[in-house]
Amino acid sequence: MRRPDPCQERARELCLAAGIDPESRVGEGRGQPAWCLYRDAARKEKLAREADAASSEIAMLRPQEERFKNAPLKVFGEHDAATIKQMRNCMAVGNVVSGVICADGHLGYAQPVGGVIAYEKQISISGVGFDIGCGNMAARLDVRFDDIRATAPTIIRDVAKVISFGIGRKNIEKVEHALFDDGDAWRESDMEAYRQKATGQLGTVGSGNHYVDLMRDEAGFVWIGVHFGSRGLGHTSATRYLKAAGGKDGMNVPPAIVDEDSELGRRYIAAMQLAGRYSYAGREWVVDRVRQIIGGKVTESVHNHHNYAWRETHGGKDLWVVRKGATPAFPGQRGFVGGSMGDDAVILEGVDSPEAKASLYSTVHGAGRLFGRNEAKRRFTREEMDRWLNERGVTLVGADLDESPMAYRRLPEVLAHHAGTVKVLHTLRPFAVAMAGEGEFDPFKD
């Protein structure tokens, strides 16, 4: 039996207020009721109300020291009220020095995706999130696109056969890595019991917006781009430590903060760092495996996390900077940022400027969503998505409508909001994309 839609009534009201019959049909074929176009707006209103309610719960937590109250928040781009409120709620707990919302930001679990918070001697477990160490890697090959243009569809299908996509998958091939021999790292993080499972999942990609892209740069050279994180290891670590810290799982919940010098804090930091190393190892393995399929050698590579906590110095202070869906961009530091499926990606570099300092040397991790996953499935069809990709010469293997490029902002528009903080070194145009297929559900993929 289908559950009632809590946003339907408000969506119908918004539709009527716009002078449209809620039951009129819109879209191709049989279409859908017009009120469905207003459901996302109704959902955001609901989330904003929940964020207001969460403020009361946050006020009942341990009082925030006066010197950490009203910490500055730098906002890039435009965001809905629910996202801003969620960020303010996060910054009302713990030793917060400053915060940032990047231009691709949107609501996330406990903290906005695209949200950056600097803490003094503390870390937010919920801020780092469930996919610890999620990030991007891109590698340039000494192979030209013109040399593989004709075989590109076959290459990406071979990639989809060799690399495991989806939830809970194991690697088709046995992968050995020195990380699994580092007994101290597994013991200090209290994750020893999960070592064997993690061994089997290293090099698997997952679902949702996680991908393997083949792209070409301005000079015509081929790049491999990948996006995924620490798989089941990171999710298990986050779940265990979130529970141990008394935190909650959800959108509008107080952040789970731990002191760096507490026993729980030390173990969580060890677990986070282990998951970060695991993420790096997995992405490096996938890139090299795809390189073997294409041929050639790597001539340049860029690699970064965007779900992690870093020990950094800002304004002369030693801080923990928690980035959830945000790319580190210190002066001279390079990063790989993907667009939506089929859109251009970029290799960028941080610059030194007052705006960059205010951003905590952080930038976007992608184009950012316009519509939630369920909303995207209601609004767009597979035919529309395939046509959009075909017009751009992109071969797609897998993916579902929730990753439709129409559900995302355009990356150049998002990056424009960060002007003066980063510069683009390369623009990468995709020609083949591999992702998990339809029906894969992963609530923590972002």
Residues covered by each model-derived region:
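Domain-length cofactor-binding catalytic modules of enzymes
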Residues: 57-86, 94-100, 107-113, 117, ...
